[in-house]
Amino acid sequence: MIVKNKLHKDVLAWEIEVEDLNIDVKNLDYKLQDGSLFKKITTRFENHNQDLKNKILNKLDIDYIKKQIPEYKEIDIKIFKDIPGFKLWPHLDRKDHKGFIVINLIDNKDSTEFLDFDEKFLAKSSNKKNKGVFHILWKKPYCLHAIENTSNKNRYTTIAFIK
């Protein structure tokens, strides 16, 4: 994982890039996400293949994560398919999440947006394959983030939730 530019002076988020994961996302088995992270959302599906999750985890720069979030205990990898119409409104993540890394598994139309507490746009992460964002949560300056799939195609990402 290569950490690049900070997205905005008021957002603790940096563009990242990883080697090609070579995951055939369109042919994976997905199940409707179970609601443990996102209640009442019926437009996000999850793949539970542990070998793929380990492959993704091995591409992350754990030393860099430890340096930025020394109190972290674990990294929970999720592989998502967001169908057209998927939307997470501007929000803060759960308190047990210290940060996250989103990686696009294909070129997606939409990507994570960061907003202030008046929901004014601040920055947007990359939507390109093998690129994404590393965001530190619960440290100042605080901000909201949101995502929506406005395309007519599925959006494929992996998210490493740093706890």
Residue ranges, per PLM feature:
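Exposed regions on extracellular, virion, or secretory-pathway luminal proteins
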Residues: 21, 70-73, 140, 151-153
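Non-heme Fe(II) oxygenase catalytic core, chiefly the N-lobe of the double-stranded beta-helix
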Residues: 63-99, 103-117
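Non-heme Fe(II)/2-oxoglutarate
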Residues: 1-71
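Catalytic core of Fe(II)/2-oxoglutarate
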Residues: 85-86, 95-97, 107-163
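N-terminal start-of-chain detector that recognizes signal peptides
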Residues: 52-53, 72-78, 129-134
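N-acyltransferase acceptor-side catalytic subdomain
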Residues: 26-27, 31-33, 37-51, 55, ...
